[in-house]
Amino acid sequence: MKLEFKNIKKIFGQKTALNNISFTVKSGHAFGLLGRNGAGKTTTIRILMNVFKSTSGEIYVDDKPINYQTVSFGYLPEERGLYPKEKIFDQLIYFATLKGMDKKDAIKSVNYWLDFLNMTEYKDKRLDTLSKGNQQKIQLISSIAHDPDIVVFDEPFSGLDPVNAKLLENVVKEQVKQNKIVIFSSHQMNYIEEFCDDILILKNGEIMISGNIKKIKQSYQRDKLLISSKDEKQILDTFPEQAEKDNFGNIILHLKKPEDKQKTMQKLIKEYDI
């Protein structure tokens, strides 16, 4: 399957939320959608899932306008939302069948993912008796148990401890292995680099960078960092001889030595809102 966004534009009143957004993702690949809050990531996802209609542009699947009756989606929202007082197994089966899966297949799939995430012992418990991390695992299962064609993860690693983050990594790899289209929305580049072949970085509804991660990294000089931050003044003051602003409002930080890149990045992430 090939998913293609073609010149998608979305206008709310006088505000252009997305301006001519285009990208392509194929089955068996993960795609990273990056940007700070308000960049346009959520609007892009909602247009993809037919929550919003685009002002102009088109979405294609296998070179034909998308048919939402035949393409199935799995969506893990940043805001979690299952029934806290209901038994876990019952509601997972309910959601899988609600999304069109046969009950027998739903039972098999739910049991598979409960086992995959080491959650079988909790299947007959209520959701509100579980820890936050385990509740997130159940939410994850509800988004993929019905075997969707396209899986969308919206800030999936938010609030996860390292153990659960690793489990989620394994789920993502399994989805790619099963030939799904996987779309990540995140502001955490380290996770995006772990899974994604291609990325699209948004700022104020505009594409800043788009393409294959490896090729993008090769095309940029090793002695520079491109930074987008709310703390731009502090960064410019901290690195007065090394930092400058580009035409897009980003900061270009010139490294004294290329081998300092990792150390400098860690300092920036720790001390500033990057």
Regions found by a protein language model. Name each.
Residues 9, 66, 89, 189, ...:
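Alpha-helix N-cap/helix-start and coil->helix boundary motif
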Residues 5:
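Conserved catalytic Walker-motif region of ABC-type ATPase nucleotide-binding domains
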Residues 169-255:
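ABC transporter nucleotide-binding domain
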Residues 27, 121, 229-231, 257:
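Non-catalytic surface loops within mature trypsin-like serine protease
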Residues 244-274:
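Non-catalytic connector elements of ABC transporters
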Residues 10-184, 189-203:
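ABC transporter nucleotide-binding domains
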